[in-house]
Amino acid sequence: MTSSLVGSEMCIRDRIKRERNAVKDTRPSAKLSYARMSVQKACFVLDAIRGKDVETALAIVTYNPRYASSVIEKLLKSAIANAENNNGMSTENLYVEECYANKGPTMKRIRPRAQGRAYRIEKRTSHLTIVLNER
């Protein structure tokens, strides 16, 4: 009796796995975790490239003087390479469908000050995600 239960339980698990894999997102993307920048500073650059085609987005981040733009440029190039190699998409039709920054853990450091005091320095991190799609 237990063997029949085990068999039916396996069928249910297989069905659940098949359903989960069918829903998987097939859009090319790239993620960077624990980037050493605050979410607010990363969003300045991400807001500028959201919805643009990839050539325009690359031009924007290349000539943007912010530190976040150099990190996002690498991430965008990685997403473009993923689209070409893994999905077989051409770069002419690609655009930035989603790009967002989520808050990561904050490293807390101490800066010594006068008369025995200490100030807390918060080194913020963020998780960056770029999702591309074809027009």
Residue ranges and their predicted role:
Residues R13-A101, T125-R135:
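Ribosome large-subunit tunnel/peptidyl-transferase-proximal elements
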Residues L5, I49, N102, A114:
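Short glycine/serine/threonine-biased micro-segments
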